[in-house]
Amino acid sequence: MAPFAPMASGILLLLWLTAPSRACTCVPPHPQTAFCNSDVVIRAKFVGTAEVNETALYQRYEIKMTKMFKGFSALRDAPDIRFIYTPAMESVCGYFHRSQNRSEEFLIAGQLSNGHLHITTCSFVAPWNSMSSAQRRGFTKTYAAGCEECTVFPCSSIPCKLQSDTHCLWTDQLLTGSDKGFQSRHLACLPREPGLCTWQSLRAQMA
């Protein structure tokens, strides 16, 4: 049996080296979609380094919340959030915070699970100062007006068409190859009349 052990180890190593890489892939959402689909949306500073839990499946970041835009009813008696949780590995969509600036504020949109706020690399997490004034207005107030009736419908290839009058066709990725185009930075999908949603300028909402 002795000669078999090195051979078996070699085979296992070869299988491991030749196994296809499984990386996390996702399409970034429009900011309005991120707001509407999240349980909690806050502005916060990352004030602590990542801590891995005892199972090594999750890690958490200590944060200092400075503003809450969504989630008051979901959090109920625990309105203050001190930690956010994420998978410990990037291959399973774990979020890794790379900024070392602990005074920088971030917009964080995530999901609640067992009273804890969870995010992944697919979540909307962005430096507050990098967002347009229209986006900040959207998260502060306007996006919520479109959550019940309207849907941002991504279009990444031709042909694509609306499936409902309550859909707004999001073409940033198609036209610019980026999710940070004009519609993302300046528009919201809002009710125009009952049963009809259209892109509307967030600048007009700011007037």
From Swiss-Prot:
Disulfide bonds join 24-93, 26-122, 36-147, 150-197, 155-160, 168-189. GO terms for cellular component: extracellular matrix; extracellular space. Residues 1-23 form the signal peptide. Its main location: secreted. Glycans are attached at residues 53, 101. GO terms for biological process: cellular response to UV-A; negative regulation of catalytic activity; negative regulation of endopeptidase activity; negative regulation of membrane protein ectodomain proteolysis; positive regulation of cell population proliferation; regulation of integrin-mediated signaling pathway; response to cytokine; response to hormone. The activity of TIMP1 is dependent on the presence of disulfide bonds. N-glycosylated. Residues 24-147 form the NTR domain. Zn(2+) binds at residue 24. Residues 24-27, 90-91 are annotated as: Involved in metalloproteinase-binding. It is found in: Secreted. InterPro entries: Netrin_domain, TIMP, TIMP-like_OB-fold, TIMP_C, TIMP_CS. Metalloproteinase inhibitor that functions by forming one to one complexes with target metalloproteinases, such as collagenases, and irreversibly inactivates them by binding to their catalytic zinc cofactor. Acts on MMP1, MMP2, MMP3, MMP7, MMP8, MMP9, MMP10, MMP11, MMP12, MMP13 and MMP16. Does not act on MMP14. Also functions as a growth factor that regulates cell differentiation, migration and cell death and activates cellular signaling cascades via CD63 and ITGB1. Plays a role in integrin signaling. Interacts with MMP1, MMP3, MMP10 and MMP13, but has only very low affinity for MMP14. Interacts with CD63; identified in a complex with CD63 and ITGB1. Belongs to the protease inhibitor I35 (TIMP) family. This is Metalloproteinase inhibitor 1. It comes from Bos taurus (Bovine).
